[in-house]
Amino acid sequence: MEMYNADGSHSEMCGNAIRCVGKYVHDRGLTDKTELTIETRAGIKTLWLNVADGAVETVRVCMGSPEFRPEKIPVAAAGETFLEQPIDVLGETWIVSSVNTGNPHCVTYVDDAMALDFPRIGPAFENHKLFPARANIEFVEVVDDHTLRVRVW
């Protein structure tokens, strides 16, 4: 599986995209298996398709272990992890955590995910000097005890 970002650059992996690939190959009759292995730039991933009445209902994927060490994410920072750390983005301090789940991610909690000036703030985070390989940015709003609203740049 080759994954490309919106700007045309390569991505190592995308959990949602690989699930779509699993559904696609089953729906198109390219396989009738319910356990698939797919090669990605982040390694070989295993998928399990939950099929009922010939239709894929859900796809589960083994993403591997998350990587929290800054040098493995990568994040230009010292320490054992980069969790709940302040960074400056466009003159504002944000508390962020970073992880690699096949490609770099940066997670920050916000009061209102839909109110963000996404076209402005997204690229500023993605291309921040902290992320030498850039990063996927998740802006997470806690809606209630059971619901999160997440916008991904």
Question: Where are each of the predicted segments found?
Answer:
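Active-site proximal loop and beta-alpha junction motif in alpha/beta enzyme cores
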Residues: 1-13, 18-153
